[in-house]
């Protein structure tokens, strides 16, 4: 695996625009998609048009990104190089690759690894026994590490960040809290505070990799 990774990085194809890759080592639920959208929104706020590249063939993720960052160019294409060309043709000035940490054959200017505090504090085993796609030594490819938490405490996330940062001098490690901020109407777009749910019985449906965390957040 390490030899293949080194070979793929050596042969990596450079994309036609500055490129930021966001991904994780575990199977979903880390918050990489919200982070990718946040980075794209940051670019928009600074007068740049971001292109968000997704590996899929469609589905809900492109819709989510378009809703979160309306001024972004969103392209879903399993061929990221073709996707980058299409994004540039539509006016993109910088590329944000969602779920691209294992995409070693594509070059990037900034490689961001997102680690869930809940996963890092849990099972250490790779698939299929545990949640990990790669061993934690793969964090050596990161230029920045972001430890996210949902129901884990700030102290737990901080401890994970400290542990991951040891021996990786020059690689920043930060923490982020993923929280439900408000309710938003799918059709109306209207917003309501979470307090409207207090004391009420509701049906919660989630199409995310870690639905349990969503249910726990609604209950807090």
Language-model features: locations:
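Walker A (P-loop) phosphate-binding motif
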Residues: 3-57, 151-152
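Anion (oxyanion) recognition and catalysis
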Residues: 44, 167, 219
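Beta-strand-loop-alpha "switch" segments that mediate conformational coupling across diverse proteins
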Residues: 173-184
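Phosphate/Mg2+-binding loops and adjacent switch elements
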Residues: 48, 52-168, 175
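Rossmann-fold NAD(P)-dependent oxidoreductase module
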Residues: 38, 42, 98, 217
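Short, surface-exposed amphipathic charged segments that create phosphate/polyanion-binding patches used
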Residues: 88-91, 185-197
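Redox- and metal-dependent alpha/beta enzyme cores, enriched for Fe-S-associated oxidoreductases
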Residues: 190, 197-220
């Amino acid at each position: 695996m390490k030899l293949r990774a080194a070979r793929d990085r050596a042969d990596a194809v450079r994309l036609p625009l500055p490129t930021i890759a966001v991904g994780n080592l575990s199977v979903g639920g880390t918050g990489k998609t919200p982070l990718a959208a946040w980075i794209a929104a940051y670019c928009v706020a600074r007068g740049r048009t971001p292109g968000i590249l997704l590996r899929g063939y469609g589905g809900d993720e492109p819709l989510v990104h378009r809703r979160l960052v309306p001024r972004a160019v969103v392209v879903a294409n399993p061929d990221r190089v073709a996707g980058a060309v299409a994004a540039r043709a539509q006016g993109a000035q910088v590329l944000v690759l969602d779920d691209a940490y294992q995409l070693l054959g594509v070059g990037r200017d900034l490689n961001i690894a997102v680690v869930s505090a809940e996963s890092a504090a849990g099972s250490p085993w790779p698939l299929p026994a545990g949640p990990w796609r790669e061993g934690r030594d793969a964090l050596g490819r990161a230029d920045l590490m972001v430890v996210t938490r949902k129901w884990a405490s700030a102290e737990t996330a901080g401890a994970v960040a400290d542990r991951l940062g040891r021996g990786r001098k020059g690689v920043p490690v930060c923490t982020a809290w993923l929280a439900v901020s408000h309710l938003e109407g799918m059709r109306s777009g209207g917003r309501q505070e979470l307090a409207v749910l207090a004391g009420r019985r509701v049906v919660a449906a989630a199409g995310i990799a870690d639905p349990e965390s969503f249910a726990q957040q609604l209950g807090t």
